[in-house]
């Protein structure tokens, strides 16, 4: 009955022809989703001949199934702008929480891509501003604090944001161009879903397919924060310095997976260079200290070696390919939060 309350203001009690039952209009897409029916037109055709579907919708054998265009018009005119599906989801979630079926202390999140119903050949190229990264304002403040601490001048604010060229679907402009593997490219959506350890879905968000999981995280977490989670378990797509810092600062434990160190085969790996917090330097395998030089706008401190020492180093060929024999190691100013995540990964089984 709560659905009638949610849609009450979209119906007139004393004008017009008798309307379709709003509960039935909500149930129809559920049939389409549960049974993987490709289109609303085919869903309505199946409802006409399937007695189980009719019973679920409250239709007798003599009742006429609604026309597929009738469903589309009702949805777009009455429900689309109201966020009806979101309201129904929230209401049912509240019932589950009150019944004690959900344990929000440990929340698992993951993202997947859903192919859009859009022709890959129908698009325009346009220039758009690059999306600001999560916690970019806080990062900018701490970058300048770090530079001042090291005797460097603060960076000037960026006057003009970077732009990039991207494909915009003329069929479905809200979708995004997604690179699926090495060769497949499609217009798609990125769906982020959170669930508890029993598998109950707690929240979701949908973004354009070209939005990275880490950029979609803030919208999803905003829905999870009222549940007061103690642990957030996620895959490597969410393993970034900003997300690690954000969760730890909120006293939420991030449980993130092992990620293979990047680097060229046969070359020294980042783990071979040890950061010395006390002296703020990086020690190489041959015990040379790489000293601090600058902090970049992206939030990375640069530590550089002495080329004169490196020129005679026995590990030079597997250490760096730079022409001046200088090794450069970068370390994010929030790297310590990722290191805490590594400690957590080894603690919890």
What are these regions (language model features)?
Residues 1-30, 35-36, 332-338:
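Basic, short loop/linker segments at the boundary and entry of helix-turn-helix/winged-helix-like folds
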Residues 36-49, 59-349:
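Anion-binding and metal-coordination hotspots
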Residues 53-57:
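Short amphipathic alpha-helical interface patches used for protein-protein assembly/oligomerization
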